[in-house]
Amino acid sequence: MTSTQAIFEKVQKVKKTINTATTAEKNHALEEMAKQLWLSRTDILAANELDMTTAKGKISDVMLDRLYLDEERIAAMAEGIRQLIDLEDPVGQVLERTELDNGLVISKKRVAMGVIGIIYESRPNVTSDAAALALKSGSAVVLRSGKDAYQTALAIVTALKEGLAQTKISPDCIQLVSDTSRASAQAMMKAKGYLDLLIPRGGAGLIQAVVENATVPVIETGTGIVHVYVDKDADQDKALAIIENAKTSRPSVCNAMEVLLVHEEIAERFLPRLQKMLVTDRVAAQEKTIELRLDEKAAQYISGSQARPEDFDTEFLDYVLAVKLVSSLEEAVEHIEAHSTHHSDAIVTENDSAAAYFTEQVDSAAVYVNASTRFTDGGQFGLGCEMGISTQKLHARGPMGLKELTSYKYVIQGTGQVRK
């Protein structure tokens, strides 16, 4: 087992091969990585089967779905890498250029971050996405997977490094920490001087631990207590379609809806239709039903479990939905501001004034009008694969693509000027 410190030192020695790589060299590397990922699919699937076997009975079915890989998902991972080839290289872009009265020309230039650390849980695609994004944005990467997905992550990293071996960029620019204990996570949090940025991707406990304990700069990828508010002026057919997609298409992801707010004026007609869609129709289709956790007002119209106060502060990542009735748009916004993690929140309404009020007042990274929250995703936003969804305001907010993984410096060109 290679120590975490040894990994930090190794990546420092080779980071210049990626920090200074040309766009053509990086794109060639991405193509080779994508190619080798697909060619190694048999090994990756075998490793994933080991992880799945070990994890069964220890994590929920929804979390098992996050961990599971098949050829289709590996193909999507490879395609995600290739999509970055077509995106503009942010490194070297001149953001601003100013000529002063004294003749100095000051340029603000985008540069690589250096070395990026990622601590994540049971998401195999994060391994390939993070490595590819770091590479295209000019940085080396140190990956620390959760133990549930370690064998899969190792097989993926092995394939990516085999791809890099065919290029001018050192394979050691991608490092996977073999120690999945808390000690390695702590080492990454304290790796000042080795990591230029640390990004946690996972549950609330992991993210909170990193934010509270790290001495290196951190971008917080928040949990998703995601709300959909159905206004009294909503198109109810549209609302039901949005809710079905936001809750059932993939409940285990951070942009899935967890809380439904409904204006009480439409509850009598709307809630029975909601229950039919999420429960009755799914029973008939032999699909997993949604457990509805209802506040007292909602329970007057449909049946379900009684909602506890903490249900409105929980990222279920499962087939569970908390439902609350509100008396006004203002009450809906107040509830969201009190309980949201500022990830993604949506309003369904045909009232332009209500939509404008919602988008101005809700302080989340992504605010939707008449659309599913499942679109909060780098690929859907045209950014390619993403490093995560930032819920903070400094440096990056929302889906983090290539530009969000860079920094900048000032280049000052003179002709001999001295300060008087």
Curated annotation (Swiss-Prot):
Signal sequence annotation: none
Keyword field: Amino-acid biosynthesis, Cytoplasm, NADP, Oxidoreductase, Proline biosynthesis
Recorded GO MF terms: glutamate-5-semialdehyde dehydrogenase activity; NADP binding
Catalytic activity entry: L-glutamate 5-semialdehyde + phosphate + NADP(+) = L-glutamyl 5-phosphate + NADPH + H(+)
GO cellular component terms given for this protein: cytoplasm
Pathway recorded for this protein: Amino-acid biosynthesis; L-proline biosynthesis; L-glutamate 5-semialdehyde from L-glutamate: step 2/2
Annotated function: Catalyzes the NADPH-dependent reduction of L-glutamate 5-phosphate into L-glutamate 5-semialdehyde and phosphate. The product spontaneously undergoes cyclization to form 1-pyrroline-5-carboxylate.
NCBIfam families: PRK00197.1, proA
Name of the molecule in the record: Gamma-glutamyl phosphate reductase
